[in-house]
Amino acid sequence: MKKLLIVTMLFTLALSAQAQWYVQGDLGASKIDITHVNSSNSPSFTQRISVGYAFDKNFRLAVDYTNYGKVTANYADVVDVSLKGKSLGLTGFYDFDLADFKPYVGVRVSTNGADVTANARYYRIEAFATETRIGIGALAGVQYKLTDNVALNTNIEYNRLASNVSDVGVKAGLRFSF
C-alpha cells in the first residue's frame, strides 16, 4: 500500500512538472451582428480574463469571462435597441509547439448574457430585458514567448452567442504561467 502511494505521488509530481496553471488577460475589438436588425458598424471594446491549465505542450483548457461591451442598433427605423453582452466560457486549445512562436486553434462553449434596452422612436415606450443563451465559437491565434512565464497573445475568433447574434473579434493580451 505504501509503495502504491509513493508511485502515485511521484506520478503526480511528474505530471505537474509538465502542466502549468496560467492567467491571461486580453483586450480587443468585437463586431456583434444581430440578424434582421441594423446594428451599428462600429466595433465595441472587448475585455476577457481567463484562468487555464496546460496539460502538456499541446493541450490546454481555460475558463473565461468576456465583456463584449455595448452595441446599438435599430429595428425597422422604429425602435432603437441597446445590447450589453457578457459571457462565461470554457475553451479547449490545441497548441502547435514551434519554439517561441506557438500558433493555436480552439473551440469555445459558453453561456452568454445580454441586457437589452429598447426605445420606441415615435412613442414614449421603453422596455428592458435580460436574456441568457448557450453559444459556441472557434478561434485561432499565436502566442510569442517573452520569458519562461510570460507570453504575448493575439487571436481572432468567431462566436455564435445566440441563434440570431454572432460576434467576430480580434484580441491581444498577456499570459502569465505559474
From Swiss-Prot:
GO terms for cellular component: cell outer membrane. One of its GO terms (molecular function) is porin activity. It holds the Pfam family Opacity. SUPFAM superfamilies: OMPA-like. It comes from the Bacteria. InterPro entries: OM_autotransptr_brl_dom, OMP/PagP_b-brl, Porin_opacity. Disulfide bonds: none annotated. The keyword Ubl conjugation does not apply. Keywords: Signal. Residues 1-19 form the signal peptide. The keyword Signal applies. Coiled coil: none annotated. NCBIfam families: autotrans_barl. Belongs to the opacity porin family. This is Uncharacterized protein HI_1457. It comes from Haemophilus influenzae (strain ATCC 51907 / DSM 11121 / KW20 / Rd).
